[in-house]
């Protein structure tokens, strides 16, 4: 179970990670970090290539043009959005912003506050289906991907108009609150018993 929104395995040391890999993959994985990274890359890419559907969230959605933005350091989100023929995006109403110019602020804020970076390794903007070129009966054919966007309410719209809760809409889930929280640094994220851990 993740303990941190941006760094979900921060509570594990390399030996615990190796045990997790070994248990999941049913093979002996050494606690060598570069080896584990290569193993994760190999296994995940095999799964991505076989997938009929990729499901992602989004760091923001732009009302002006309907685009969504994904901000990552690993590149997995880009693979999930491009290889499978169907892409499903699940995004909460609180992540919708008016204009593309507003996205620039979030793109500066997230890496700085989340991981102390100037910019992330991968920034992906998606504003509709992209063509997929593949071989069919000896010929290269072009087909459009299918992209579905699910807007998640779950009380979000009501919270936006509540004087006590509307401040929650300012959260971009960078986790900087966790990084400076003395309680979180003492007890960790698991004691909160929910997806979002204190802070």
Per-range role (PLM):
Residues 1-160:
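Iron-sulfur-associated redox domains of electron-transfer enzymes in respiratory
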Residues 38, 97, 165-171, 175:
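Conserved structured core elements
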Residues 105-111, 115, 173-182, 186:
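Hydrophobic alpha-helix feature that most strongly marks membrane-spanning transmembrane helices
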């Amino acid at each position: 179970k993740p303990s941190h929104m941006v760094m979900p395995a921060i509570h594990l040391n390399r030996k615990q990670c190796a045990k997790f890999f070994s248990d999941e993959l049913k093979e002996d994985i050494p606690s060598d970090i570069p080896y584990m990274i290569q193993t994760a890359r190999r296994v995940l890419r095999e799964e991505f290539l076989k997938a009929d559907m990729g499901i992602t969230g989004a760091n923001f959605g732009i009302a002006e043009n309907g685009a969504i933005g994904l901000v990552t350091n690993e590149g997995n989100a880009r693979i999930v959005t491009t290889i499978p023929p169907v892409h499903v995006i699940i995004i909460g109403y609180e992540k919708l912003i008016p204009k593309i110019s507003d996205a620039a602020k979030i793109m500066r804020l997230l890496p700085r506050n989340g991981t102390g970076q100037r910019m992330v390794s991968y920034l992906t903007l998606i504003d509709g289906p992209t063509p997929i070129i593949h071989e069919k009966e000896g010929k290269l054919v072009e087909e459009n991907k299918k992209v579905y966007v699910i807007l998640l309410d779950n009380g979000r719209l009501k919270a936006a108009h509540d004087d006590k809760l509307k401040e929650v809409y300012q959260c971009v889930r960078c986790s900087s609150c966790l990084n400076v929280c003395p309680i979180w640094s003492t007890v960790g994220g698991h004691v909160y018993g929910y997806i979002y851990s204190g802070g």
